[in-house]
Amino acid sequence: MVSSTCCRSVALVVLLGLSGGVLAQGAKTPSLGEILQGLEANLNHYDAGVPSLFCDEYATSSRIEPGERDYNRVTDSVFRLRRTPQPDHTTSLVESREIKSFDGKPATAQKMDGPALLSGIFEGGLAVASVEQTKCMNYSLQRVNKKRPSEPYVVRFATVLTAQNRGDCFLQEESKGRVFIDPASMQVKRLEITTPHHMIEDGSAYATGDVGRRELSVDYAPVLLGDGRFWMPSAIGMRTTSGSGFDTVVWSFRAVYRNYHRMEVTSRIHEGKD
């Protein structure tokens, strides 16, 4: 998953007027188009403004296969999201982590080798539902219960991938899912993506690839970073299954994120001696 900071930042000023409480405070329920514009505005705000940051990441992953010993791993890490300059004078968001421990023991290496891994959510997960992605998605707004105005709006989506649009699409595999949106801020509270035929492992000249069903969820919560307020992942879950019956293999990944901090760049001037 790749962030596209440079492409979307231009629309920030135009769309901000439709974001936040403006939509939620109106007399009528916003249309699907208005909700997508609000999501796009918040996405642009995130892309243009989220600073380099770090937080605590506590992740558990497992692989369960019939006839094999279960493989479980727990990692405790410092997760980092760094805003990195590019040659074309734009910036991109790059994920990394410093692993502190594996299964409760101090880490002797920094390679996170599974059994289940996930990356890219911080870089571009919010792009799944946006005006920009209408060329790649079919969106529909779930019926809103007007007696419960504080309940999240729910937007359903399904990919429409073609040879012509695939290069512009955030999701590169046929998928469907739901986005739960806070009415007061037009921020994403929860994202769910189901990919029925996810490529788990690429094939080769000697073996076919491993394909399975992947179910992914991301919960978001507001975080104050310096003077800015951003909705960041608080929990990420993934479950992938391959095979059927007694031959079913299950991979799972679950991570929680806490204690967000903005990266501070400090400098110190050393005065030379006369």
What are these regions (language model features)?
Residues 25-176, 183-189, 194-274:
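Structured extracytoplasmic
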Residues 19-21:
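N-terminal signal peptide c-region/cleavage motif recognized by signal peptidases
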Residues 1-11:
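Bacterial N-terminal signal peptides that target proteins for export
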